[in-house]
Amino acid sequence: MEVRLADCAGFCFGVKRAVDTVYEQLKNGKTIYTYGPIVHNEEVVRELAEKGVRVLESKEELKNLKAGETIPTVIIRAHGVAKEIYDIMEANGLECIDATCPFVKKIHRIVEQKSTEGYHVIVVGDPKHPEVEGLSLIHISEPTRPY
């Protein structure tokens, strides 16, 4: 049997949707920001940067972005973010376009529901990974930590 590896496999549904969202917003001629890289693909992030998309890497950068004559557009990455990020955007009058993968959003809703029902939610994963950060900081009613 011969096993052949593809040079590239393409994007999953959620990543494709997030990237397509950024390209659609670029058509409007506005300055576009993403909170964190839109996806884990340096080639895509670099291509978007060449088209003018700016990546906000921290809460501090986001806090410094304010609505003025124009309202900045910030697109949430495919992996989701913590509730605090949405709150900062709202407080600063920013346009928020949520490109979080629907499957990730579903996990957020389940974790939030179970946490609210009194279940102890254990998140296993890299605490610095965007999906784990989003789950740990957005949807759990009591303080917890990823394992």
Named regions from a protein language model:
Residues M1-K16, Y23:
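Positively charged, low-complexity intrinsically disordered leader regions
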Residues T31-I38, V123-G125:
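Short internal beta-strands
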Residues G36-V53:
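N-terminal beta-loop-helix "entrance" segment that forms/cooperates
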Residues V39-V44, A82-E84, H129-E133:
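Short, charged/polar "capping" segments at the starts of alpha-helices
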Residues A49-K63:
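Glycine-rich, highly charged phosphate/nucleotide-binding loops
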Residues L62-K66, I71-I97, H108-R109:
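Phosphate-bearing ligand-interacting subdomains
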Residues A91-Y119, V123, P127:
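Ser/Thr/Gly-rich flexible loops in soluble cytosolic domains mediating phosphotransfer, phosphorylation
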